Structure formats: C-alpha cells, structure tokens
Amino acid sequence: MTFHPSTDSIIPLPPDIVTNVLGVSYAHVQSSDGGDLYLTPFGVTHFDLLQIENWYEPNWFRSNKRRLEGTSAVHWVPTKELKGKKLDLVVKNCRVGEDVPLATHTLKEFLNTEFNSPWEEFALVMEMRSGAFGPSHIAIRTQEPLGIYVPP
C-alpha cells in the first residue's frame, strides 16, 4: 500500500526549524546519522517515512534500490512500511561540483555544462508547479519534491 498525503498526517513544526532556500520552505532536522534532512511541505506530511533509517539504511537501500535509466545516479527505492504505510521514492544523488563525463557529451557542444544543486532543482520544480509563468491555461503537473538529505 502506498501512502498518500492527507491533512491528518501533518505534524506541527516549531518555527526555529523552518528555513527558506531559493523561495522554497523546508523543515530542517538533523538525521539519525548526524546529517541534515530538509523536508518540503510535501515531505513533512511523511516525516516518519522519510527518516533516513527507513529508506537509506545501507542494507535496505542496497537490497531494495533499482537504478533508473539516465546519465546520473537516480534510483527508485521503497521506504520501509510504518503503521501500514510506505512510499515509493525516486532518489537522485547530487553531482554539483563534479566534472561532466565527456563520454556522454561532446566537449565542443557542452563546454560549460554544469549540474544544478538540489536546491535549484527543487526551486525550479516548485516554480513549474505554481504556474506563475507562461500561459495561464497550462498547468505542469510534476512529482512532489519531498526533501533533500545532506550526509554528515
């Protein structure tokens, strides 16, 4: 069974954990391994499921992940089931600061190629979701960005 967001799953947040990056609000909490977990309003509704021990614990992640096609490190992984609920996640490893692999691009065409940070990607997705730009009759339905995990 896949869990869908509902208003009864929203937990109250103390104001000192709420932050804003590039126009996107996040609840910033420390993960069990000492890293940082930034949850969007979509992610806060799944707070318990998104704790890293429920999807990124090394044995669980290694056993349950499926690599998705593409040039970057993107995986599908289910969360562990909690109280009869689970989520199917798409996990993308950040490649900011890495060199672009030349095997996938020609140097001449993509000389100045860079990777977006997760903050930039989430801001762009939220901008598309809001429909603030472009024709008002066109809505772009995207996946709901849940959160950004920064390892210790």
Where does each model-flagged region fall?
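Juxta-kinase regulatory segment immediately upstream of eukaryotic protein kinase catalytic domains
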Residues: T2-K65
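Conserved ATP-binding subdomain of kinase catalytic cores across diverse folds
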Residues: F47-P152
